Every structure is written in structure tokens, then in C-alpha cells.
Amino acid sequence: MPSIDCKRLQKLAPKSPENQSKCISRLRYMVMLDQVESDEGGNSSTRPYVWAVLLNAPPRNADEYIRYVRQGPSPMAQKIQNDVSRTLVVESQFHSRVSQSSLSRLLNAYVWKRGALYVQGMNVLASPFLYACKSENQAFQFFDRLLQNECPLYVLPNIDGVHRGAKLLDKCLEVLDHRLYTYLLSKGLTAKIYALPSILTLSACTAPLSEALTIWDFLFAYGIHLNILCVIAQMFIFREQLIDHPSPMTLLRTFPPLNAKNIMKITILLISKLPPELYNLLARHAWDSEAGVLIDRLT
């Protein structure tokens, strides 16, 4: 099948409100089978529309965003600026398209809107939106929607959801590949040591950004909780090197370049191998505090 372009997306538009959920389900399936059209750098005229549907983020005028931008630097401005200057440093195409001032404005506006603390890593989470979206305002709306609806526990001051995601990654790895799990454990390596950046940023901390965008298409379609399995899938791709290496943390400090197609394929296979109770906690860990209590009790 051809990639998903604007023509295919228009044909999918629901003819009535009753048909909407069916059309969204079809779009999710298309995202899994056929990638969203893009050039080698990940630029796509279709992706913003796909994300708008999958994130349930309809267009909004820019008045709100402009209002927050006009408030100027937030109380977290210095911390934001420190992180903005080192965001996706190896992604030259990103920096040719997205300015530091744009990223800084968006993050400060979010702090003003939500009265929230800025958490390190939010700079990387915001970056794909600024790269892919048609406007800074659209990027802000998508970013806000992601953090508020999909992973609110990831951006608490103590990043509870991220730490629970790391605990679940360990439990999933123990089930899915006991040999790799026990080898890493014998070296004192748990997910809290090597996987927190990949969990918090939904794998966007690993280059190239063009592949991360395709992974985000998949995560927005089926749930950002699947990023935990995407991280395991990335590890499976260089599993033998990890097991053969006397100091595997040397390899885990910098994951190999993303290959979205392979990562998604492995992730889909892994889902069916998890016990239902564990998958249920995985599906809820980024937004449900009650699931967090159960995760904290896991041994």
C-alpha cells in the first residue's frame, strides 16, 4: 500500500458523526501498516493532520498562545534556556527549521498556562511538534494535549510516571527475555539507570528525528505506553552485542540509530507475550495514579 498522504486522509473523513470512531480505527490501522508520507528528513504535509486526529486536538486560534507568550519569561525561564541550548544537538535539520527562541517560547507558554514546573526532558518532547507542525501555535496545542491527556504523570516534578515506566520496563524485559534481563541485572543495570531519557522523551532523544516521528505516529495511534516496549525492541536489535559485552552500559549510554519499521514490528510481536495484568498496568502507568500504587508494590 502507498504511504498515508492527504488524499488518502481525505477519503477517510467520516460522512457522519456516527461513523467517526470507525474512521479513526481505520486510520490507526493504516498508521501501523503504512507510514505517513514524508521526505528523508521527516518533513510531511500530512503528519499534522494525522496527529490532530489521533491526539483529538482540533484546530484552535492562536489568541490563547499569543496571550501566554506576551507574558514573557516564566519563573522557569532560566532552566528552560539551559536545556533549550542543548536540545537535539546532532539534528542539524531540526536546528535549520526550529529556532531556540521558538522552543523557549513554547515551553515558557506551557508553564504560564498550566502553572506547572518545567521538567528536564520537556524540551525534547516539544521539539518534534515544532519540527512537524504547521505553526508554533499548533505545536503548542499538540504538546499541551500530549502532556495533559496522555502522560501527565511523566511531567510531575519527581517524574513519577517515568520511574514507574522504568520499573515496568524491567518487569516486561524479565518476562520477554529473561536471559538479557538477568545479564543486565548482574551488571547492576536496571531501566532507571539506562532508559529514563528514552522513556521520558518517547524515544525522541535517539537519532534520527525522522524515524522518531514515525514512531510517534504509531504511539499516538495505539498509546504512548507502547514506548516502553519500543525501548525494549531497540534493545533487542542489538541484544547479542549487549550480552557479549563485559560492560553493556557502554552500549546503553547511546542507543543505535532508530529504525522505526523494525522497532514497530518487534513491538507489535511483544504485546501478545505479556500477561494481561502486566499489560494493563503498562497501559495505565503514564496517566493513572491508581495504577501507580499497584506498580509501586511490584517486586
Curated annotation (Swiss-Prot):
**Do you know which InterPro entries this protein is assigned to?**
Rab-GAP-TBC_dom, Rab-GAP_TBC_sf
The record's listing under Pfam families reads: RabGAP-TBC (PF00566)
Task: Offer a single GO CC term for the protein.
Answer: mitotic spindle pole body
**Keyword annotations for this protein?**
Cell cycle, Cytoplasm, Cytoskeleton
Q: Return one Gene Ontology term, BP aspect.
A: negative regulation of division septum assembly
Q: Which SUPFAM superfamilies match?
A: Ypt/Rab-GAP domain of gyp1p
Keyword Cytoplasm applies: yes
| Places the protein is found | Cytoplasm; Cytoplasm, Cytoskeleton, Microtubule organizing center, Spindle pole body
Q: Which domain of life is it from?
A: Eukaryota
The Rab-GAP TBC domain extends over: 41-223
Q: What does this protein do?
A: Has a dual role in the cell cycle. In mitosis, it is involved in maintenance of cdc2 kinase activity. It is subsequently required for regulation of septum formation. Could be involved in maintenance of cdc2 kinase activity by preventing, directly or indirectly, the degradation of cyclin or the dephosphorylation of 'Thr-167' of cdc2.
**Would you identify the family this protein belongs to, as annotated?**
Belongs to the BUB2 family.
* Name the UniProt record assigns to this protein: Cell division control protein 16
